[in-house]
Amino acid sequence: MLNHFNFKLKRDVTIIVPGEAFVSNKRVISTILGSCVAVVLCDESSNLIGMNHYVLVKSDLDISPAQRGRYGIYAIPMLINAMLENGANKSNLKAKLFGGTNFMAKGSVKVGLENSEFAINTLNKYRIPILAKDFDQSKSRKIFAFPESFKVIVEYPDGTKVF
């Protein structure tokens, strides 16, 4: 995790890397994604947002507690719990999902697709509404999530979108 002042945004930003998550009601949260997925949760009543960044759905190996955030099977429940521990109300949670790029779409293993489908299915299981998804493109992206508006800015190599 890296905290810095982003001169373009004129804001304090916390950058998370694979396996990390962060919850805030003040700081913008950012990460860079390819086939990994970031789940961004919001409780608008408390201006609270949280973001995780997971690499794979699961692992067949034994995983140390420090590595669990790298796998969606742990990362999504951990993010939900972190939101609740920081004052969110589960019935107010909403989600936006990003990443899931399939750089090698012709290969038999489509990590991005598996990651994105897992996020959708898991949030449906928790009955958390998904307000936006940005998957299925063959390009990387950098995302910025804002706590006061739940706006997420996505920067691609060739442009920007707002979700």
UniProtKB/Swiss-Prot annotation:
Alphabetically sorted, this entry's keywords are: Chemotaxis, Hydrolase
Q: Which GO terms describe its molecular function?
A: protein-glutamine glutaminase activity
Q: What Pfam families does the entry give?
A: CheD
EC annotation? Answer: 3.5.1.44
Family matches, as CDD domains = CheD
Which GO annotations describe the biological process of this protein?
chemotaxis
What Gene3D superfamilies does the entry give?
A: 3.30.1330.200
Name of the protein? Probable chemoreceptor glutamine deamidase CheD
